[in-house]
Amino acid sequence: REKDMNKLLEMILEEAKRITNCDGRTLYMMTDDRRLKFEIMRTDSLNYYMGGTSGEEIPFYPVKLYLDDGKPNYHMIAAYAGLTGETVNIPDAYKAEGFDFSGTKMFDEKTGYRSTSFLTVPLKNHMDEIIGVIQLLNAQDSTTGKVIPFQKEKQVHVESLCSQAAIAITNKKLIDDLKVLFE
């Protein structure tokens, strides 16, 4: 069952990549205690693939939606999308204001990568529940390979994919729960 879910999540991420021609992508799922757990991380140019069917554990703690003082964690881009249900499109993380990109910058320093454009989209199901977040990184011009901002029309396609994906994930979980019930 878990393998089937991982395959579904990977299909969703790969479709988002196809739509946007992005280099990196992360899928987070909402935990029962309202945190965003890293499920799959991929960055093609770094040959970086963790979670999902890779068998590689993701060594990062889940993203807290709420800080220790109980305030919403609006400074983390994934948490912001998970809390508000809003898509966040950032053309250049190094020039963006209002979000904390210190973790991103640390990753870049360690790997020599340059995280630039971000598209972060909540996974909202048919009951309007946010069940996860997809974060895409570094859209690329299909001709030159140069990193570009995520285009608005591609954002709309990804948002549509995410709402369909959230319904598929919710349905898969319900079916799996029913199977367990009848075993």
Regions found by a protein language model. Give the residues of each.
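Signal-transmission/dimerization alpha-helices at domain junctions
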Residues: 83-87, 133, 156-178
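Flexible loop/coil segments at beta-strand boundaries within sensory signal-transduction domains
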Residues: 124-130, 139-142
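Signal-transducing coiled-coil linker helix
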Residues: 181-182
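Signal-transducing coupling segments at domain and membrane junctions
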Residues: 73-78, 86-87, 91-117, 139-151
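Short N-terminal helix-loop-first-beta-strand/juxtamembrane motif that initiates sensory/input modules
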Residues: 21-25, 87
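A short, aliphatic-rich beta-strand micro-motif
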Residues: 116-125, 132
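GAF sensory/regulatory domain recognition
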Residues: 26-72, 77, 95-96, 134
